[in-house]
Curated annotation (Swiss-Prot):
Its EC number is 3.5.1.23. Pfam families: CBAH, NAAA-beta. Belongs to the acid ceramidase family. Residues 1-16 form the signal peptide. It comes from Caenorhabditis elegans. This is Acid ceramidase.
């Protein structure tokens, strides 16, 4: 299937800005069918846990790690099995190199990762690798939109597992299959109170999506650059930037320490980091929404909702705003088309979920959709997949 699809796309690309995919893989907005796939009860399929920041770092993740240790071990095992044919000594390399580097991690992440390794019985190097490999290649769609009354909604699909083991029986990516079993929601507590919310893969201590009540919401999408996540990992592995900030740790730091939309924006725009990223930031007030396109040491591009060409929404996949997507990976065009069909009067959890449940923003890599409202502190994670003949990414 993948071979025939690739040939068709290669033939079509010569003069096309947006390549219409061949049936049955073509883009499709379910709003055209007057479908509603949003079922709020599905949020309860995802379990909630507490991470208490008042506890020592060595104690914060023990419950989560213990409850999910089989899933964590299974995922890491699949990862190593995928790497081993190309790198026969992969497991020794991971155990030795990442194990030796773990003590050099910044606190509190160092103690948290050590405790997860202890609670699961999984070697320290493997838990360390698990906590940074999301920095390399995560393809996603994030949306910030406001309704006619200026209420802001923030959502994203998280797509992960590209080229990580195609399952010819289930027609799905092996890593994506494993990750769907590991999705959790987290209440982060401080001084006995809720500080912020996130969803995570069990045992992963960074943050890709988070909401701080009455302050801001945050998602992070990979930004593919020549000097990208691999470069940051190599710098870290060779000790050139042992205390550097991974993008998911910078997101977590922002949620823990910043109290307003503007403070969070300034911090995300200006803090040096190890991997390029798009930070999509939402607030609780009208027009509070932006896309921060980050390089390693600065902001390359800032796009504000108040000046968006779409007027009432921003949509980010993994390309700079205003640039053309790679023809094999154009999720912007179907996303824009479906958002325009939604219209501003239908903005809300239901409407945006249906946009993100439309192909190809929904694809074989999609593991979940998260929906957030800073104003109401509402945070929902809904498991996603794209069964049948669906585009692989």
């Amino acid at each position: 299937m993948l071979r025939e699809l690739s040939v068709l796309l290669l033939v079509a690309v010569c003069a096309a800005k947006h390549v219409e995919l061949p049936a049955p893989f073509k883009d499709h907005c379910i709003l055209d069918d007057k479908q509603n796939l949003y079922d709020p009860s599905k949020q309860f399929d995802i379990k909630w846990y507490d991470v208490n920041l008042d506890l020592p770092p060595s104690e914060r993740w023990v419950q989560i790690a213990t409850a999910n240790k089989e899933h964590i071990a299974d995922l890491i095992g699949v990862l190593i099995n995928l790497i081993t044919p190309w790198f026969p000594n992969a497991i020794d390399f991971v155990d030795d190199v990442f194990g030796d580097l773990a003590p050099k991690l910044a606190q509190p992440y160092r103690d948290e990762i050590f405790s997860i390794a202890n609670a699961t019985g999984i070697p320290l190097g493997q838990i360390t690798m698990y906590n940074i490999f999301y920095e390399i290649f995560t393809v996603c769609t994030s949306v910030i939109a406001q309704d006619k009354d200026g209420h802001v909604f923030h959502a994203r699909n998280l797509d992960f597992g590209l080229f990580m083991g195609w399952d010819p029986v289930l027609h799905d990516w092996q890593i994506s299959q494993k990750l769907r079993k590991m999705i959790i929601n987290v209440n982060w507590l401080k001084d006995g109170k809720l500080l912020y919310k996130s969803n995570n893969f069990a045992g992963y201590i960074g943050i890709y999506n988070g909401l701080k009540p009455n302050a801001f919401s945050l998602t992070a999408d990979d930004r593919f650059q020549l000097v990208g996540g691999y470069y940051g990992i190599l710098k870290w592995v060779f000790g050139l930037e042992a205390d550097g900030k991974w993008m998911s740790w910078l997101a977590r730091e922002t949620l823990e320490t910043k109290t307003t939309y503007l403070d969070a924006k300034e911090h995300l725009m200006n803090t040096p980091m190890l991997s390029p990223v798009y930070f999509i930031l939402g607030g609780s007030k009208k027009d509070e929404g932006c896309i921060i396109a980050r390089s390693l040491d600065k902001t390359a591009l800032l796009t504000e909702m108040a000046t968006s060409p779409h007027g009432w929404y921003l949509l980010e996949t993994n390309y700079d705003q205003g640039t053309e997507d790679l023809y094999l990976d154009d999720r912007d065009t179907p996303g824009f088309r479906c958002m325009d069909k939604l219209t501003q009067k239908n903005v809300g959890f239901e409407g945006i979920f249906n946009v993100l449940s439309s192909r190809t923003n929904l694809n074989k890599l999609t593991t979940y959709t998260v929906l957030m409202s800073v104003e109401t502190s509402r945070f929902e994670t809904i498991l996603q997949s794209c069964p049948g003949e669906c585009y692989p990414w």
